């Protein structure tokens, strides 16, 4: 997958179930260890400018992407999709198995549908 064009990048958006709701993603993200959060934030920033190392991002299903970070045997993930020029973070979690858990993928797909119902298929111009 080619890196995104930095000139076309927007800003990170965080999943929330309604226009005025608190971002659910942030609650999940806050549960991760400090070091994992810091590393994932750096990766998220690097994604915006197209400066990710090989293996830091992986397509999961449909247009859901996985941002990946690990230290030793501890693996952390952010699942997201592109909403126009903006990446939308859907869920964050610790991964303790070989494959990304199907429940996390289903959560991301469900949240993507909810986001698009609440905010539209593309952001307003």
Swiss-Prot record:
GO terms for biological process: detoxification; negative regulation of growth; response to hypoxia. Its EC number is 3.1.-.-. It is an enzyme of class 3 (hydrolase). Induction: Induced by hypoxia and by DNA damaging agent mitomycin C. Part of the Rv1954A-higB1-higA1-Rv1957 operon, as well as the higB1-higA1-Rv1957 operon, which is probably the mitomycin-induced operon; the former but not latter operon is autorepressed by HigA1. Induced in persister cells in response to D-cycloserine. Keywords: Endonuclease, Hydrolase, Nuclease, Toxin-antitoxin system. One of its GO terms (molecular function) is RNA endonuclease activity. Disruption phenotype: A triple higB1-higA1-Rv1957 disruption mutant has no visible phenotype. The keyword Hydrolase applies. Coiled coil: none annotated. Toxic component of an atypical, type II toxin-antitoxin chaperone (TAC) system. Upon expression in M.smegmatis inhibits colony formation and cell growth. Ectopic expression in wild-type M.tuberculosis has no effect on cell growth; ectopic expression in a triple higB1-higA1-Rv1957 (delta TAC) disruption mutant causes growth arrest, killing a considerable proportion of the cells. Belongs to the mycobacterial HigB family. This is Probable endoribonuclease HigB1. The lineage of its organism: Bacteria, Bacillati, Actinomycetota, Actinomycetes, Mycobacteriales. The gene is higB1.
